[in-house]
Amino acid sequence: MGQKINPHGFRLGITTDWKSRWYADKQYADYVKEDVAIRRLLSTGLERAGIADVEIERTRDRVRVDIHTARPGIVIGRRGTEADRIRADLEKLTGKQVQLNILEVRNPESQAQLVAQGVAEQLSNRVAFRRAMRKAIQSAMRQPNVKGIRVQCSGRLGGAEMSRSEFYREGRVPLHTLRADIDYGLYEAKTTFGRIGVKVWIYKGDVVGGKRELAAAAPAGAERPRRERPSGTRPRRSGASGTTATGTEAGRAAASADESTAAGQPAEAAPAAEPQSTES
């Protein structure tokens, strides 16, 4: 199940949040259709902006749109002309006042949507698909928050007559673990042979109690601190029974003799053992 379903929808309310936040009763279908139109409007005209995500939040008379982009300068435009144009188009589409927020993505190499878009752009420029996939994996694995990545391309790869799918993976990508923070991205490359779909899964660690687990501070090969032994000789063990040298009668007598000799007193003789009868 985890291998087929969309990782975002599979983990809603666990590690991921909804990208559209609003409540409606009778206008639910209209709002869903409007959200799809908003995302389509932003994706068609801003291909070069590197939009990673679009979040929509609604109130009674206002719509807030958050655009997460790797190139905010392209979205804003010169003196804000592009941002004003986008805001005007959204207000015309929704019929409400639109609050537009443009947020910059700090690490585009660790965003699955941007990685998929980068691979698709290389495929459109006639770059070999294996080379594009490996380059994307190498750049993503350099990021400290990326624990694993999987990149898959499907279509007429290399201009072949029959379509197929190939993927490369590095690190861990646990798709069926609900606490795993997995980012997913999909993009289509338009080539002369047809469209090639690019899918990217990026694993960024586990989320427990709403917080991402950090890597262990101590390295795996670090040695535990050794406890110092007290000075002096360690008592010897006699035989396989595991008793110490003072655990028998002869041992206790020898120990008392050593103590009395050290104190300057004559040592007491050990009691003689009673002879055992051998009568039959």
UniProtKB/Swiss-Prot annotation:
Residues 238-280 have a biased composition (Low complexity). GO terms for molecular function: mRNA binding; rRNA binding; structural constituent of ribosome. GO terms for biological process: translation. Residues 215-280 are annotated as: Disordered. CDD domains: KH-II_30S_S3. GO terms for cellular component: cytosolic small ribosomal subunit. Binds the lower part of the 30S subunit head. Binds mRNA in the 70S ribosome, positioning it for translation. This is Small ribosomal subunit protein uS3.
